[in-house]
UniProtKB/Swiss-Prot annotation:
The lineage of its organism: Viruses, Duplodnaviria, Heunggongvirae, Uroviricota, Caudoviricetes. This is Protein ninG. Residues 35-64 are annotated as: Disordered. Belongs to the ninG family. It comes from Enterobacteria phage H19B (Bacteriophage H19B).
Amino acid sequence: MAKPARRKCKICKEWFHPAFSNQWWCSPEHGTKLALERRNKEREKAEKTAEKKRRREEQKQKDKIKIRKLALKPRSYWIKQAQQAVNAFIRERDRDLPCISSGTLTSAQWDAGHYRTTAAAPQLRFDERNIHKQCVVCNQHKSGNLVPYRVELINRIGQEAVDEIESNHNRHRWTIEECKAIKAGSNRKLKDLRNSRSEAA
């Protein structure tokens, strides 16, 4: 049998001639040290694996708790979530447009203002034709400033669409599932709109 070629000791890096093929230490002392190092590495690896597993299990438990908590949320919570998502999309959609009521291009805060309010026409609260970017003064301090809102609304969406909004009295009770779908859809549209604008820039 051919004698194993000389190799470097894993501990001291000195060249030596091994007695057998899987020997990587030049002396018994270095063999012991190498064995301890390997055992420590294996233990560290096992500990890391166990820690990863523990974290995965912990995350699974957190996810389960989160799902259970969401399942207990009332319908009002999901209506609010959906409205926030729709409003965010509207503000981005109308980003370069002035306030629909006053025509101002400057505002301390931009809202997504409803032509027919959510209290008067809850069935239209998510209708994008009924919601437009509006300055905080018109929306919150002038009760929507609806007279000039209507004039500009006709310019933007047409008389027929405005008539349809004004004549809609079909009350609708939004379900949790509908609100979840609206939230997801609005978030997706917002992302797509931002991406398309970034690509066009």
